[in-house]
Amino acid sequence: MNNDARIFTVGDSPFTITLRVQETNGRGLNAFVTGGTSPHVGGVALAVPRDRSDGKGLTCDVSQLCVPGHKDVEAAALVAKALALGMHQVVCVTAGIHVDNASGDDIALLMQNALSAVEVYLNSRA
């Protein structure tokens, strides 16, 4: 197992997202998504990839666990699914993102930055 986490940062403050990925040599990924003005642990998602029932590609099942009152699990699930489908591995993501008084547009930007960080990671693996 590679003990070095790979770190990717996307976006401008206060909407910066950092993705840290720990690889296990093809046996799963563990990732931590933080950002905004107050990184923390707010939610966890586990994505398990599997073949689609129609045989046309890959899908995944995503389980979620959130800290009460936190919505970070939505970012965790989004990133876990994208990583699982991109890497064809089981993925566990912990997320904690906070921006004071974030608007709907601010939250959308944070989510887009999280997906962009996943894209940067996946492209680094190509």
Enumerate the language-model features and the residues they cover:
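Conserved mixed alpha/beta catalytic, RNA-binding, or beta-rich assembly cores of soluble enzyme
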Residues: T9-G86, V90-D100, D106-A114, V120-S124
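Extended amphipathic alpha-helical scaffolds
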Residues: M1-I7
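Generic structural signal for short, solvent-exposed loop/turn connectors between secondary structure elements
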Residues: M1, S124-A126
